[in-house]
Design a protein with these regions (language model features):
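Flexible, compositionally biased loop and terminal segments
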Residues: 1-281
Length: 281
């Protein structure tokens, strides 16, 4: 996911469908909706255990939140939504839970593909997908291929994903190209390095949401969230629905995004420096 200098999109590029204007929150400025929202969907298991249910019940209920948040993003004109669906560390969970998560993913992709196509959303995937079970990988690849030509919202699933692993994989590809003489390592800059990341054509997240009442980023999009606004929700993921999403967007719109500039520079309309090494003071 490449660096992008826009702090908020100038106008929604995806149409507002399945929702009337009256359904939208009156305080949300549609001209300043984040272009790219990334979500760490945490708390499924804890939500279930707190209700005396098995952890997998939380994952099943979490699917409803996925559906609702995708529709909310579409309604508000978000251009890209990245969902942290399965981390590379999640392979260490009990085998039964992992198997159920894979089954739910396959089922979701199969049942939701018609709606995805209806709204011309484009499914993408990032992560070490070679570790997925064959049937799961086929389901993911089918959804990606089926929607490749769609021009609506990008829906990115982070699967078998880790931020450090992504950077390592990028470094390996870069090293191979340097060895073959395809690039000049001495002339490499941050933009050049970012082009080796999993989805370098997608702009960096503007807003990172984490549910589950935790205060950490859990190895998610480590390179890309350098200037993202962070919203930590106390809600477990199965409880995070449209209203909570709208609250996160309102929180985002109250922030002043400086990208290393002063407030005075931002107010005067100074352009953000393209350097990702600048610190936000």
């Amino acid at each position: 996911m490449s660096s992008d200098s826009s702090s908020a999109k100038s106008a929604p590029s995806t149409s507002i469908e399945k929702s009337s204007v009256n359904d939208l929150h009156p305080e949300i400025d549609l001209e300043r909706v984040p272009r790219h929202v990334a979500i760490i969907m945490d708390g499924n298991g804890r939500w279930a255990v707190s209700r005396g249910l098995e952890r997998n019940a939380g994952h099943r209920e979490g699917i409803e939140s996925v559906r609702e948040i995708i529709r909310a993003c579409r309604d508000y004109g978000v251009e890209c939504l990245t969902l942290y669906a399965f981390s590379i560390e999640n392979w260490n969970r009990p085998k039964g839970e992992v198997s159920e998560l894979m089954r739910l993913l396959e089922e979701y992709l199969e049942t939701e593909l018609a709606e995805v196509m209806e709204h011309r959303a484009q499914v993408r995937s990032i992560g070490r997908l070679d570790r997925l079970p064959p049937s799961t990988r086929r389901a993911v690849e089918h959804a990606v291929e089926k929607t490749a030509d769609n021009d609506g919202m990008k829906l990115v699933f982070a699967l078998s994903y880790g931020g450090r692993a992504e950077i390592v994989d990028a470094a390996r590809r870069l090293a191979r190209d340097a060895e073959l003489g395809k690039i000049d390592a001495e002339g490499l800059d941050e933009k050049g390095f970012a082009s080796y990341l999993y989805a370098s054509d997608i702009p960096d997240p503007d807003l990172l949401i984490r549910t589950g009442a935790e205060q950490r980023i859990s190895n998610f999009l480590l390179w890309q969230i350098a200037y993202a606004e962070l919203h930590m929700s106390q809600r477990m993921w199965p409880e995070f629905r449209r209203g909570e999403f709208e609250a996160a967007v309102l929180d985002y719109q109250r922030r002043e995004r400086r990208f290393g500039l002063t407030s005075e520079q931002v107010s005067s309309g100074s352009a953000r420096s393209s350097s990702a090494n600048e610190s936000d003071s």
